[in-house]
Amino acid sequence: FNAGPERGVYDEEVERAALDFQQNAGLHADGIVGESTLKKLEAVRKAESGREGKKIPDRDGGYVPARSLAGNSVTIDPGHGGTDLGVTSAGGLAEKDVTLALGLRTAELLRAEGCRVRLTREGDDRVPVYARAEAANGAATDFLLSLHCNADASPAARGGTAYYFQRSHYYSEHGRRLACSIGARMEAAGFPWIGRFGRNYALLREARGIVLMVEPLFLTNPDDEDLAQQPECMEKLARALVGGL
């Protein structure tokens, strides 16, 4: 009864698994995990405890055992677009333009690595957040990188951040480790790094695969605003993202 990866979300995949279990266990198949279903699940768990092949939620400590990126499916999600400008710098630079430039270059580098790459937008288009998740899910993506910029009331605020899925005590171990890896690459490339954080954002929750939202720059910081307009900066950031994957 394959319910997919542990994400702390009762979605269609989990509901189908619940229905299959109920039908095979001789229960009323309604997809509702009530008292009778929980009792039967607990009985099965006790019966299976200690047997070979017991489910482990996170193999290899959260790492994906691969020598290269070749063959992986990656979705790049440049945040905002169209009438949704996102953050706007003091000089009028829109977040939507920065994320698109970074996303397009990251996609080029990933294709050169042999990845199958899809972008949620390749032009100045406004794409709803759930449509972004559906695009990634439809492509059966292995990795989803959502690109944004940060902002703060203080122009001194600076440093990259990454967000992985977390709700209550459920979190994505793969996402957390990817955030750490990308952060290390950004620091090695000379960019300040604040850290990684678990969040229950819609895209992180709804998209399958290993999902991460990255905000490498503060557009409200004058130095970052200047960097965001330099092609060599976009190149370094894109290479840090690809290296982190």
Which sequence ranges carry the predicted segments?
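Catalytic-site microenvironment of enzymes
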Residues: F1-L245
